[in-house]
Amino acid sequence: MEAIKGADVNVPDAVFAWILDRNGGVKPLTDNDVIDSEHPCWLHLNYTHPESAQWLATTPLLPNNVRDALAGESTRPRVNRMGEGTLITLRCINGSTDERPDQLVAMRVYMDERLIVSTRQRKVLALDDVVSDLEEGTGPEDCGGWLVDVCDALTDHASEFIEQLHDKIIDLEDNLLDQQIPPRGFLALLRKQLIVMRRYMAPQRDVYARLSSERLPWMNDDQRRRMQDIADRLGRGLDEIDACIARTGVMADEIAQVMQENLARRTYTMSLMAMVFLPSTFLTGLFGVNLGGIPGGGWRFGFSLFCILLVVLIGGVALWLHRSKWL
């Protein structure tokens, strides 16, 4: 493949443009640099920036059918061979479990043995690990190593997020054992996060598996083996997601049962109270009619005797309920 002039890929508003130095480090791209398989370039763009969008639309270095994909139209994880290059779309979780489940960030990559062009709109936090390694001189040395390290970082972030969700589910299960019900909508949000993760991580695992089996010229056998390990690790994460989804279904049934039991207990308590006080209510209503005068109204102990009668009546009803094992 022909070498590329640095001036042809030096986009002014790029997030960064680096030359891999083959020793695990990078140096800033200049117009005088020559980009080839021995000195590959990583160009990272925000496709919403004007000059980056203009470069993506006009550069002859990219195939025509790649431009739209790099400009944000491709969202589902996939991998496509495009002549001498490869187009890869990946997803990464960026934040904590408090975010909405659709906060998965897309990153699109077109690469060959000379050039890596990656685009995004929102920042991909997983790339910070790769960038840090390159700045410290312990990063990837070539395009194949770069792709493996990026996929490894994305999988690490996904695994951490899945682990956080798993811990939340364990806490919910422990709380349910103590009859503590989560806030309204909490379990639904947790379940949706799991489902969205499952939706995008399953095809991403397939992307990793295909990259490990494709005979890409810029990947060696060791890098393919590492990519297969990453695919297997993400597959175990997907198994954990499936288990968590099933557990949230069980918890939803358990929450419904706890709420039903609480409602039944309250209804039962109110019914018992009504049964205890029903006779006394009848007597007070009967004596309060006052059509022929209140019985015992002229006797000074009449009210006291009536109160004693009510207490005895309530006690008798309560004793009957207790012996009947209702109370």
Curated annotation (Swiss-Prot):
Residues 1-273, 322-327 are cytoplasmic. It is a multi-pass membrane protein. The chain crosses the membrane at residues 274-294, 301-321. InterPro entries: CorA_cytoplasmic_dom, CorA_TM1_TM2, MgTranspt_CorA/ZnTranspt_ZntB, Zn_transp_ZntB. Keywords: Cell inner membrane, Cell membrane, Ion transport, Membrane, Transmembrane, Transmembrane helix, Transport, Zinc. One of its GO terms (molecular function) is zinc ion transmembrane transporter activity. Its main location: membrane. It catalyses: Zn(2+)(out) + H(+)(out) = Zn(2+)(in) + H(+)(in). The keyword Cell inner membrane applies. Pfam families: CorA. One of its GO terms (cellular component) is plasma membrane. It comes from the Bacteria. Belongs to the CorA metal ion transporter (MIT) (TC 1.A.35) family. NCBIfam families: PRK09546.1. Zinc transporter. Acts as a Zn(2+):proton symporter, which likely mediates zinc ion uptake. This is Zinc transport protein ZntB. It comes from Escherichia fergusonii (strain ATCC 35469 / DSM 13698 / CCUG 18766 / IAM 14443 / JCM 21226 / LMG 7866 / NBRC 102419 / NCTC 12128 / CDC 0568-73).
